[in-house]
């Protein structure tokens, strides 16, 4: 078997080979390993014996590996194997030495099987087939037997050594021939597997030809049905195109409705702003009314002051009237005294003292009159001052009244502005109503178009029913094809 492998075994390739997964795939679980060990005759004693030979493996590993690779390099067919690996020969020798040392581990479980399976896969990737693999192992058989023979005959004499050498010489040819037979048997197995694979491929090809013949009629029916579906699809497409045109009209109407809605929204914004202005003006009117109310309150207070001043004038007038009465009494008494003085004067000659008394009385009355006159003068001055104060209060009243009038006028102007704003709001609402009417008309037109679209949708639905029936037929045909194809499995 020649080496036709062109795969380069790199570190990534080696790391990508999972020995455990490979062992699981070929069925090397614990039960299978136990059966193979038992069938081969490897029991606990055998394992113990192999473990006891570990010193021998360690002593001979390097020499055996060197002989192993020298043997491979001596044949042209196996020389190409080294070019398929990125490892050097020395690195390969180290790996092979580790393999030999593993023979004496004494435990041959799933871990051992996974490692050996991985090594076997790497050999396969390298292109090292069963013929080379089994043939090259005769170098290990020879080396290990020679090492065992040397170990056995040590210090046992020439006769024993000759007997062992004869045993080795007689057994090695048999072992080599058995290995050769194993190579041929392995090739036979491989050929058998390959032949069965070819037979299976031929069988599948024949079945595929039969399937192709069987599906020809259903496929023809499927083609005819598909053609019918295509025709109905054209019909549906025409209806769909018409529906698209109508939907374009609907879209335009919707655009018009959208424009109306935008106009309504814009008018609503204007109405909102007008309402806000009206509200602000109303607040100003309320503030103006409050100012007017405060002004009128001030007027009321000023009026109260005027009233109090007038009342004080009235009281002063009463006092003046009282003083005037006193003056009248004094005048009357003065007249009487004057009369008496005249009388007494006539008697002056006889009673001068009586005249003097009268004169004193007149003098006293004159002084009292003078005091009363002074008091009257003071009262008059006080009345004049209070009168001036009353006049000032009346001026303030007039001023407050003027301010009140101004506030009322401002309130009236504000109320007029509120009225105008309300009128603007009413006008805006009228515009909203008009736009809403236009929107209603557009909506009716859209509704009519939607009815037309609905009718076209009914036609499309009918066409879809026909397509559904054709599709069902296709499904049944596909089922027939599936049953026929199922024969391939």
Curated annotation (Swiss-Prot):
Keyword annotations: Heme, Iron, Metal-binding, Transducer
UniProt function note: Heme-containing signal transducer responsible for aerotaxis, the migratory response toward or away from oxygen.
Pfam families linked to this entry: MCPsignal, Protoglobin
Name of the coding gene: hemAT
Domain Methyl-accepting transducer: 218-454
This protein's record includes keyword Metal-binding: yes
SMART domains on file: MA (SM00283)
Entry's family note: Belongs to the methyl-accepting chemotaxis (MCP) protein family.
UniProt xrefs under InterPro entries: Chemotax_Me-accpt_rcpt, Globin-like_sf, Globin-sensor_dom, Globin/Proto, MCPsignal_dom, Protoglobin_sensor_dom
Assembly mode: Homotetramer.
Biological source species: Halobacterium salinarum (strain ATCC 700922 / JCM 11081 / NRC-1) (Halobacterium halobium)
Protein name: Heme-based aerotactic transducer HemAT
One GO cellular component term: membrane
GO MF entries: heme binding; metal ion binding; oxygen binding; transmembrane signaling receptor activity
Source organism, top-level taxon: Archaea
């Amino acid at each position: 078997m020649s080496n036709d492998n062109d795969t380069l075994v790199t570190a990534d390739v080696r790391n990508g080979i999972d020995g455990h997964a490979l062992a699981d795939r070929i069925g090397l679980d614990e039960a299978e390993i136990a059966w193979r060990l038992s069938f081969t005759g490897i029991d606990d004693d055998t394992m113990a014996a192999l473990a006891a030979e570990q010193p021998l493996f360690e002593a001979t590993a390097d020499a055996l590996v060197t002989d192993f690779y020298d043997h491979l390099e001596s044949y042209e067919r196996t020389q190409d194997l080294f070019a398929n690996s990125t490892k050097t020969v020395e690195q390969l020798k180290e790996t092979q030495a580790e393999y030999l040392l593993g023979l004496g581990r004494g435990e041959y479980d799933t871990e051992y099987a996974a490692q050996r399976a991985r090594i076997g896969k790497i050999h396969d990737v390298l292109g090292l087939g069963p013929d080379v693999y089994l043939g090259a192992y005769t170098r290990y058989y020879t080396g290990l037997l020679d090492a065992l023979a040397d170990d056995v005959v040590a210090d046992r004499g020439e006769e024993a050594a000759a007997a062992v050498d004869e045993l080795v010489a007689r057994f090695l040819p048999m072992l080599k021939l058995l290995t050769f037979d194993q190579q041929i048997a392995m090739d036979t197995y491989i050929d058998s597997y390959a032949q069965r694979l070819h037979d299976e491929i031929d069988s599948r090809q024949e079945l595929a030809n039969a399937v192709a013949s069987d599906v020809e009629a259903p496929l023809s029916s499927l083609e005819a049905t598909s053609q019918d579906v295509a025709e109905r699809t054209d019909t549906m497409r025409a209806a769909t195109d018409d529906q698209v045109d109508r939907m374009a009209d609907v879209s335009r109407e919707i655009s018009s409705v959208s424009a109306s809605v935008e106009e309504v929204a814009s008018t609503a914004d204007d109405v909102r702003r007008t309402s806000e202005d009206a509200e602000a003006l109303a607040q100003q009117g309320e503030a103006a009314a409050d100012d007017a109310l405060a002004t009128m309150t001030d007027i009321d207070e000023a009026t109260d002051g005027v009233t109090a001043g007038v009342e004080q004038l009235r009281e002063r007038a009463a006092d003046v009237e009282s003083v005037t009465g006193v003056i009248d009494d004094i005048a009357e008494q003065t007249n009487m005294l004057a009369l008496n003085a005249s009388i007494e004067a006539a008697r002056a000659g006889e009673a001068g003292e009586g005249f003097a008394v009268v004169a004193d009385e007149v003098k006293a009355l004159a002084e009292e009159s003078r005091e009363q006159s002074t008091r009257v003068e003071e009262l008059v001055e006080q009345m004049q001052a209070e009168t001036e104060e009353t006049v000032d209060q009346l001026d303030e009243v007039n001023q407050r009244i003027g301010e009140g009038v101004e506030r009322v006028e401002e309130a009236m102007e504000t109320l007029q502005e509120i009225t105008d704003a309300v009128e603007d709001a009413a006008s805006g609402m009228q515009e909203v109503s008009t736009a809403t009417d236009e929107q209603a008309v557009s909506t009716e037109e859209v509704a009519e178009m939607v009815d037309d679209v609905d009718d076209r949708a009914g036609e499309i639905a009918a066409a879809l029913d026909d397509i559904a029936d054709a599709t069902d037929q296709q499904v049944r045909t596909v089922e027939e094809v599936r049953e026929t194809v199922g024969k391939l499995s």
